[in-house]
Each structure stands twice: as structure tokens, then as C-alpha cells.
Amino acid sequence: MTRALIPGSFDPVTFGHLDVIERTARLFDEVLVAVVENPHKSTVFTVVERTEMLAEVTAHLPNLKVDEFDGLLVDYALDRGVTAIVKGLRAVSDFEYELQMAQLNYRLSGIETLFMPTTPEYSFLSSSLVREVARFGGDVSSMVPTPVAARLQARFGR
């Protein structure tokens, strides 16, 4: 059985994230989406809220589980029998950082990292961009699923 791990902060989850998640779910028997709790990073939504949003918008994927974690990614992966870590790439600029992380993770655990380029229509999209648009009352409905857009609107009061 193959098991993939897709880690991220998902603050908030975007259609770009869902693109990578859904495509990964077609390739692996099981997929774990791990929402990172990073105390050094300021987030709009708590780890619990981000986990709830992801679970809601991925409920249609029967081979997927959403979880939260903090600590070393490879320890989490090894504890769960992960076959591969999957990372979405939007642009070459993402690759430079992700390659270093993939090499470190492999050295620490022997777990491979697979890079999945986003579909071109989402290559511009990032959670930080979505947060910025939402913060100023812009329409994010083409960037995030409806339940996420509603939570952003409630959070920023616009």
C-alpha cells in the first residue's frame, strides 16, 4: 500500500492546494494531509480551524485523511508509514527551497519527496495572496472553496 503525505500550513487552503491534493489522491492508495502547527509563524486561522476547513473541502476523497502536527516532518512521516512526501510547486522559486528540504528529509529518513507542479491556472495563487485580498474586502471566491471564502469574510468582517 502506498501512502503519501502532503504537509503545509494551508492558511487558508486554496484551489491550488486542492489541485495538488486531488491529483495526489488519484496516484496513491492513501493520502495524509498534515496541517503544520508552527509557533514561529503568524496565522489567520488556528491549526484546528485549518484542519476543519481542509476536512470539509476534501470530504469527497475517500482515501484522504486530514491531521495536524508539530515537530519534525520526517518523524511524523515515519510514524505513519509514509511512502512519499508530496510538495506542490508553483514556480522555479518554490523549487529551490523545496529541493533543499527534500534532500534533508531524505537524509534524515530515507523518505522520497515528489514534486507536483500546480496546474497553470493556479500557478499565481498563494495563501498569502488570498489573505491580502480578503483583508481588503476583495472577492476570493475564484481562489478558495466557498466554505473557506465564508470563513475569510467572517474573519475580516467584509
Question: What do the predicted segments below correspond to?
Answer:
Residues 1-158:
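Nucleotidyltransferase catalytic core that binds NTPs
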